């Protein structure tokens, strides 16, 4: 095998583990304050979940040509918003479906993350641990999630991964762009990620700042690339997020990766190029759980 061919396979195909973590990992700084299970009554349906620490409601919406799914998530503590790695391993070309990773971590709700494994650079901080501190040199900002549940976008060139952790950041996402900032749409009507099509399956997460200090998130996943649902533009997703009152919203990996999982089921219809309804394997997820 030629050296160039092997190099390409190593980057894009051959799995290579760097670090393994246990499932359901909690940041050491928050472990003592986080309940490991619900201690009260659990009430759930196909579209709702409620216990003494969290309340989740899933609704379905439709534009003229696209179906989307909205998760309204209220938590008693930001500790219940977590991330997980495929096969609980950080490395290259290590993937699994969103639903499989969610099940392995006992997630109540989950979405695909930023697919860190598709890139060789870009900060990777998951549950308070730095896995990668290489600047991705992108025009887009990253999203930082702090231990109190608040969101803040930042440029990697302006800081280091360790400084972020030292300031209270527990998770970062290196995809983008920022959709809503300070309650205002932050993308133009024609903006797109790279050479992607304008209408796409999308995954986005936003935060609503509540006056009582509670943690409130909005997550939206749209179907796309099918005759039944064409998909959303970044601007359309940003407008949707704004309509729910978020102060900050961020675009995560989309296309065939876009998946919403809830109460043991995949809620949306993940698809790749409209060929078949199936989940794409990804490197990481965002989830709600104990």
Segments the model singles out, each with a brief description of its role:
Residues 68-72, 178, 204, 285:
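Conserved hydrophobic/aromatic beta-strand scaffold that supports enzyme active sites
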């Amino acid at each position: 095998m030629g050296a160039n061919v092997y190099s390409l396979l190593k980057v894009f195909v051959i799995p290579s583990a760097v670090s393994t973590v246990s499932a359901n990992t909690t940041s050491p700084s928050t472990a003592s304050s986080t309940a490991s299970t619900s201690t009260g009554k659990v009430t759930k349906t196909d579209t709702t979940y409620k216990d003494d620490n969290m309340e989740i409601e899933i609704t379905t919406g439709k534009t003229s040509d696209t179906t989307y799914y909205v998760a309204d998530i209220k938590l008693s503590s930001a500790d219940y918003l977590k991330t997980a790695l495929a096969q609980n391993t950080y490395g290259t070309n290590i993937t699994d479906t969103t639903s499989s990773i969610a099940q392995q971590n006992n997630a109540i709700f989950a979405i695909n993350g930023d697919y860190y494994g598709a890139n060789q650079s870009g900060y990777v901080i998951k549950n308070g641990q730095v896995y990668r501190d290489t600047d991705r040199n992108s025009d887009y900002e990253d999203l930082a999630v702090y231990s109190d549940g608040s969101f803040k976008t930042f440029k990697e060139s302006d800081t280091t991964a360790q400084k972020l952790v030292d300031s209270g950041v527990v998770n970062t996402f290196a995809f983008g762009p920022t959709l809503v900032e300070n309650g205002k749409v932050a993308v133009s009507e024609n903006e797109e990620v790279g050479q992607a099509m304008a209408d796409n399956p999308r995954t986005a997460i936003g935060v609503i700042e509540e006056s009582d200090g509670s943690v409130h998130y909005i997550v939206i996943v749209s179907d796309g690339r099918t005759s039944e649902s064409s998909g959303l533009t970044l601007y359309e997703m940003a407008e949707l997020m704004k309509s729910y009152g978020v102060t900050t919203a961020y675009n995560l990996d989309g296309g065939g990766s876009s998946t919403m999982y809830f109460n043991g089921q995949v809620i949306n219809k993940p698809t790749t190029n409209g060929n078949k309804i199936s989940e794409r394997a990804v490197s990481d997820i965002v989830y709600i759980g104990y």
